[in-house]
């Protein structure tokens, strides 16, 4: 369980609280500059904050980076490293330090996750030969290996900042299959997202931020209303039903 009490990051993010359960998928949404990345970095223990964040009882503000790495994976928006590395080497570095790379579980997890993300034919490529979407899928695979319950029983949380940003439509579908897999294994997934229709379909809980303030929190149905979204995003939005499913239309 993830418990957050009065989390604040100076004037960038005003106090907010939440409680997230195992297997839940949380989307953090809001206009650019509203505090999404700040919130995720604080939850991951990467920047100073006031208040408290606990991941399965671990006090994030007091934990070392190695302790945090055992309990959560954090994927920020990032460029490729400048040094030379092959995909399989990058994935090997993502495996928990106390797990032998030779064990069958590691090979199985790498195989399953790389196949799911359609990167199994790229394991022997240099990361500098990858497109933006390919590199992002490799990074997603690495973060999942870090907190795979099969390899790391202490893992509880996946934190992703705009994981779909570099992906095309087909690759984005693979991402949401991966999210379903990881949540199904009992991990809590907290991610920033810009595609509100994806949030409407896939999020168990939604945090809507506006100018550093938690404007609304609740289920997708409760938060993604026409009135609320128009107020925060300042644009005309309609919610329609198509083949029995809700969709948001933007002018």
Swiss-Prot record:
ATP binds at residues 30-37. The keyword Heme does not apply. Disulfide bonds: none annotated. Residues 2-236 form the ABC transporter domain. Keywords: ATP-binding, Cell inner membrane, Cell membrane, Membrane, Nucleotide-binding, Translocase, Transport. One of its GO terms (molecular function) is ABC-type vitamin B12 transporter activity. InterPro entries: AAA+_ATPase, ABC_transporter-like_ATP-bd, ABC_transptr_BtuD, Metal_Ion_Import_ABC, P-loop_NTPase. Its main location: membrane. It catalyses: an R-cob(III)alamin(out) + ATP + H2O = an R-cob(III)alamin(in) + ADP + phosphate + H(+). Gene3D superfamilies: P-loop containing nucleotide triphosphate hydrolases. It is an enzyme of class 7 (translocase). Coiled coil: none annotated. Its EC number is 7.6.2.8. It is found in: Cell inner membrane. It is a peripheral membrane protein. One of its GO terms (cellular component) is ATP-binding cassette (ABC) transporter complex. PANTHER family: METAL TRANSPORT SYSTEM ATP-BINDING PROTEIN TM_0124-RELATED, VITAMIN B12 IMPORT ATP-BINDING PROTEIN BTUD. NCBIfam families: PRK03695.1 (NF002981). Belongs to the ABC transporter superfamily. Vitamin B12 importer (TC 3.A.1.13.1) family. Part of the ABC transporter complex BtuCDF involved in vitamin B12 import. Responsible for energy coupling to the transport system. The complex is composed of two ATP-binding proteins (BtuD), two transmembrane proteins (BtuC) and a solute-binding protein (BtuF). This is Vitamin B12 import ATP-binding protein BtuD. It comes from Vibrio cholerae serotype O1 (strain ATCC 39315 / El Tor Inaba N16961). The lineage of its organism: Bacteria, Pseudomonadati, Pseudomonadota, Gammaproteobacteria, Vibrionales.
